[in-house]
């Protein structure tokens, strides 16, 4: 795998607030290489979620360019952006959003099937990930039969199921108690490092942020290395 992960070049974004434009991002720059985990910190309302949406090709910036696995996304149409996102991106949210009627392994198999992976190969990949997350014995359980920490670990496996080049996570342990959050985060770091993914993780937890390779802070619409 080459070192291309995620690059944000001079990202700008403003929103209408009455008659005025509220500038949330004023030229944010960031580069994350394969195998690197970067913490994104800053107060609520600073623009972290907006930055993640733009990095994940869910929202277009007003200016600047997003490079995903070395591919510039700005000039692409929506169909091409969706294809690029499905091919190279994994997402983890604060709430797991698992399908309640599916078992843990089925939740991890599904995105692979959508991507055209044969079912047998998809199940093999799902069991590999669940095993690395210490969930092999819980693979046939539905989300309602799992603890909060187990549910979030399944969500992490699902995000990495298609071997993305970039992982984006928005407060992935924010809905868990401190002890559970610590354990889930340990598993997340180990799995991401083992996969060689470039990861950007938004968190309000300074202890978790300090365990990542780098910390960048949203400050007045810019990204500042801490």
Swiss-Prot record:
InterPro entries: AAA+_ATPase, ABC_transporter-like_ATP-bd, ABC_transporter-like_CS, ABC_transpr_LolD-like, MacB-like_ATP-bd, P-loop_NTPase. It holds the Pfam family ABC_tran. It comes from the Bacteria. ATP binds at residues 42-49. Its main location: membrane. It is a peripheral membrane protein. Keywords: ATP-binding, Cell inner membrane, Cell membrane, Membrane, Nucleotide-binding, Translocase, Transport. It is found in: Cell inner membrane. Residues 6-226 form the ABC transporter domain. One of its GO terms (biological process) is protein localization to outer membrane. GO terms for molecular function: ATP binding; ATP hydrolysis activity; transmembrane transporter activity. One of its GO terms (cellular component) is plasma membrane. Its EC number is 7.6.2.-. Part of the ABC transporter complex LolCDE involved in the translocation of mature outer membrane-directed lipoproteins, from the inner membrane to the periplasmic chaperone, LolA. Responsible for the formation of the LolA-lipoprotein complex in an ATP-dependent manner. Belongs to the ABC transporter superfamily. Lipoprotein translocase (TC 3.A.1.125) family. The complex is composed of two ATP-binding proteins (LolD) and two transmembrane proteins (LolC and LolE). This is Lipoprotein-releasing system ATP-binding protein LolD. It comes from Paramagnetospirillum magneticum (strain ATCC 700264 / AMB-1) (Magnetospirillum magneticum).
């Amino acid at each position: 795998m080459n070192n291309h992960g995620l690059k944000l070049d001079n990202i700008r974004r403003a929103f209408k607030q009455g008659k005025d434009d509220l500038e949330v991002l004023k030229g944010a720059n960031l580069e994350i290489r394969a195998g690197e985990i970067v913490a994104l910190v800053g107060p609520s309302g600073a623009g972290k979620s907006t930055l993640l949406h733009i990095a994940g090709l869910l929202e277009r910036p007003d200016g600047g360019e997003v490079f995903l696995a070395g591919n510039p996304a700005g000039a692409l149409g929506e169909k091409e952006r969706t294809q690029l996102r499905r091919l190279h991106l994994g997402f983890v949210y604060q709430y797991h959003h698992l399908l309640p009627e599916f078992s843990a392994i089925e939740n991890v198999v599904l995105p692979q099937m959508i991507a055209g992976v044969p079912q047998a190969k998809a199940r093999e990949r799902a069991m590999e990930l669940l095993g690395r997350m210490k969930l092999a014995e819980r693979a046939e359980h539905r989300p309602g039969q799992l603890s909060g920490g187990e549910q979030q670990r399944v969500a992490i496996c699902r995000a990495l199921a298609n071997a993305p080049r970039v992982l984006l996570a928005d407060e992935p342990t924010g809905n868990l108690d401190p002890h559970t959050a610590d354990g889930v985060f340990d598993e997340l770091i180990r799995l991401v490092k083992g996969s060689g993914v470039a990861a950007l993780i938004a968190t309000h937890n300074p202890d978790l942020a300090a365990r990542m390779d780098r910390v960048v802070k949203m400050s007045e619409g810019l990204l500042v290395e801490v």
